[in-house]
Amino acid sequence: MSLADELLADLEEAAEEEEENLIDEDDLETIEEVDEEMQVDLNAESVKSIAKLSDSKLFSEILLKIEGYIQKQPKASEVMGPVEAAPEYKVIVDANNLTVEIENELNIIHKFIRDKYSKRFPELESLVPNALDYIRTVKELGNNLDKCKNNENLQQILTNATIMVVSVTASTTQGQQLTDEELERIEEACDMALELNQSKHRIYEYVESRMSFIAPNLSIIVGASTAAKIMGIAGGLTNLSKMPACNVMLLGAQRKTLTGFSSTSVLPHTGYIYHSEIVQSLPSDLHRKAARLVSAKCTLASRVDSFHENPEGKIGYDLKEEIERKFDKWQEPPPVKQVKPLPAPLDGQRKKRGGRRYRKMKERLGLTEIRKQANRMSFGEIEEDAYQEDLGFSLGHLGKSGSGRIRQAQVNEATKARISKTLQRTLQKQSVVYGGKSTVRDRSSGTASSVAFTPLQGLEIVNPQAAEKKVAEANQKYFSSMAEFLKVKSEKSGTMTQ
């Protein structure tokens, strides 16, 4: 295989991996497309000319069927075989689809009322952004804006702070009075919107009551309303059980936003599961992570429900408990950093800076006086070997002529060896008794000698007993026991005395 073929093969593998992470085009059909602009005829005489759902045959038939099934309470034993085969299941799916159409119809009616009522109170649109709250407020105020003050019905619709802002703005608005015909059209649109909203809530209640029999495990995890919505978009419980978890998470996603609403709050690839109560109960930074986890568990629960394996919902409770445990684990504070004690220092061999052995070593290895003199130099004096006449290091003060005296080594009195007084007396007695010097004998041996240096004779060996012998010979003349009397003659008298 050539190098080009290997590169092409690598690119193909990378493309296959990207395709696995992407969503199939068939699955993209489940994402709802919302028109960027609602085509509303502002010149329409009545709201019924643009909002035709409430008068449609499908709307009335579904509501009649729902009323009939509400009166009959199903039993768990009656749910057999595929869920799609049950006649009531089709009504549930149609009711789910009808709620989506009701939402779109409410948006159309809201835009119709907003455009018509802007003639009277144009600032109300920015003060009350919610569609249903806006419709209820318009119905309550009508053509008389003074109703904002001390209105108990309005307090049930808006908060006190919003009512205060609306009342202040209403007193300074530049709007014009509506005619009776315009006011009648607006009130008719408001009544239709409120009726549609009431029908939507009734459908939700019915679907939620039936989801405990159709998909009990799925309803336990995400709630009956969300379970009914994702089942309706997926095309049934069987189709939902065949979908992967990554596509289940996208069910109910919207591609575009409605006209007049900000697009910054719209999150891409977020469906009904993302907006469910179990996911929205967490902090915002965990929403996507939680939606992935919940969609995976919903896939497992839908597969269990499609085969009616656990109608009492035990598996659903187990899965929800596992989800809640993971949610709690995610929200746990980080563990407290353990305060570790300092490690024991590595005590190596310390340098001994005192003691008898250290002093002896320092004396043995210390600098001698000769070395100190060789290392010492005088400032401002030229050295003898400054011109490199001699090889080697300079001798410093040692190489200079001095007085000729040799400085005696200083004795350190602190380290000087001492003997006790008792030992001194003992040594003195021994020297007197055993080795003491007297007129008869001496301690020194006869062969003892000393070496002396004299400037005249150089090296001279001296007998230390020579001086003593001279003294003894002189004393023998006068103090000898053999000495005789001497005769002294006087020259004058000529006599001799003895």
Curated annotation (Swiss-Prot):
Its biological purpose: Involved in pre-mRNA splicing as component of the spliceosome. Required for the assembly of the U4/U5/U6 tri-snRNP complex, one of the building blocks of the spliceosome.
Keywords from the UniProt entry: Coiled coil, mRNA processing, mRNA splicing, Nucleus, Ribonucleoprotein, RNA-binding, Spliceosome
Example of a GO MF term: U4atac snRNA binding
Motif mapping: Nuclear localization signal (NLS): 350-363
Domain of life: Eukaryota
Record-marked site positions (Interaction with U4 snRNA): C246
Protein family: Belongs to the PRP31 family.
GO cellular component, one term: precatalytic spliceosome
Region (Disordered): 1-24, 333-356
Residue ranges with Acidic residues bias: 7-24
Annotated site (Interaction with U4atac snRNA): R288
Cell wall biogenesis/degradation among keywords: no
Main location: nucleus
Comment field on protein domains: Interacts with the snRNP via the Nop domain. The coiled coil domain is formed by two non-contiguous helices.
BP-aspect Gene Ontology terms: mRNA splicing, via spliceosome; spliceosomal tri-snRNP complex assembly
UniProt name for this protein: U4/U6 small nuclear ribonucleoprotein Prp31
Annotated site location: Interaction with U4 snRNA and U4atac snRNA: H269, R292, K297
Subunit structure, interactors included: Identified in the spliceosome B complex. Component of the U4/U6-U5 tri-snRNP complex. Component of some MLL1/MLL complex.
PANTHER family reported in the protein's UniProt record: PRE-MRNA SPLICING FACTOR PRP31, U4_U6 SMALL NUCLEAR RIBONUCLEOPROTEIN PRP31
Subcellular location as annotated: Nucleus; Nucleus speckle; Nucleus, Cajal body
Coiled-coil intervals: 84-119, 180-214
InterPro entries: Nop_C, Nop_dom, Nop_dom_sf, NOSIC, Prp31, Prp31_C
